[in-house]
Design a protein with these regions (language model features):
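Insoluble glucan recognition modules
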Residues: 1-227
């Protein structure tokens, strides 16, 4: 890099990448430059909100793969910006999208969905979330699920239940393919849940209103209110 008189760095990177990620290691004074061609977020908008609210899908790895979880009902589209329609993506055949001025995505039956978009190959998928449940020693054992019910008014998956002192996680469709626990290996981190190897959540014995809010990585949380 070029180092200025004030100690600042200037790095010139060839190419036409949309974004640049620079990682600096101050222990050994090295740096790494990564060219990134995808934004961190894209957005879904559709009939479920009267086409008025954009729902964020997050791409944590900047590889063009985005995911989010939302209540859906009817037709919808994807777009790169929350506040305008520039460059929005439409239906381009089953499971495919394109910026072609085409029609909306086919309507979905009302329900809560896992939405996946891959801009690298211009595909998408909407997977119905049939259930989200509590499982763990706090729930009796790791073989028994207690189902939550989605509440459209609060935007949360909810249940009032009695829990033992112990550990628990939340999982989708009674399966371990997708589950949520505490981010950063922290079992007390109720305010930031991850589906990427989340820690078992620690819970004290009691009866609680459990409210689980699932949107995307960095925006998932659970609120336990003692009853």
């Amino acid at each position: 890099p070029e180092i200025g008189d004030d100690g600042s760095w200037k790095v010139v990177v060839a190419g036409d990448a949309k974004l640049i990620r620079m990682t600096i290691n101050m222990m050994d004074y090295t740096y790494q430059i990564e060219k990134i061609n995808f934004n961190e977020y894209i957005y879904e908008i559709g009939n479920e909100s009267g086409w008025s609210t954009a729902h964020a899908l997050r791409g944590l790895n900047f590889d063009g793969k985005y995911q989010g979880y939302y209540w859906m009902d009817g037709e919808y589209k994807f777009k790169p910006n929350a506040d305008n329609w520039d460059g929005d993506w439409e239906n381009d055949g089953e499971g495919k999208i394109a910026d072609n001025g085409g029609s909306n995505m086919p309507g979905l039956a009302a329900g809560f969905y896992q939405i996946d978009v891959n801009l690298a190959d211009m595909t998408y998928a909407a997977t119905l979330v049939e259930s989200i449940s509590i499982i763990g020693s706090a729930n009796g054992n790791w073989d028994t699920d207690t189902d939550l019910t989605y509440n459209q008014a609060t935007g949360a998956w909810e249940v009032t239940t009695t829990l033992n002192a112990g550990e628990m996680k939340f999982r989708m469709n009674h399966d371990w393919a997708i589950s949520w626990g505490g981010a950063n290996g922290d079992g007390t981190n109720y305010g930031d849940l991850t589906q990427n190897n989340g820690a078992n959540l620690q819970v004290a014995a009691g009866t609680y209103l459990v409210q689980l809010y699932i949107q995307h990585e960095g925006a998932n949380k659970v609120v336990l209110t003692a009853q």
